[in-house]
Amino acid sequence: PSHNPELLKRAHENDILTEGYRVVAYCPSCQTSLSHSEVNQGYEMVQDPSLYYKVKLQDEDVYLIVWTTMPFTLVTDAMVGFNPDEEYVYVSVGSETWIIGKIRLEEFMKEAKMEDYKVLKTVKGSEFEGKKYTHPLLGNISGLEKMSKQENYHITIAEKFVDVNAGTGIVHLSPANGEDDYNI
């Protein structure tokens, strides 16, 4: 007991005690954080809702069609991810131009019940790295407009972990709700 402060001091001096940040699962009813094993203990496959939504790029008159399996995290959306090595298509739909992963185009258009569209061009996901977009709820969430002005907020990233075989091949990332998203 009386030696605990000394142990902490030595650990800090030897650089084995550090301070950092990470996302931790939290149980509101227990009012405590949960370990990875506690979170995984009750794991079972369930049907989750997914959501497609549009975000407009700020430097082009085009919309990214983004997919998420966690719609409740949209309010804390900070980035949109592309796979740098995969192909994405610019698609004319009515009076708008959408960007969708090429592999998922036909399946997505069937799911969205869109029959009248035209592919305009194809580009690699790496071409979208670092572009700013406008969050769809920008005027509806307190403080979001201020955060959106930050250089590294509401930007597109190109990362190999993005799965182009699901959704639209463009995913939303919410560092406030996912450890992997936070680590980016």
Locations of regions flagged by a protein language model:
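NTP-handling and nucleic-acid-processing catalytic cores
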Residues: 1-184
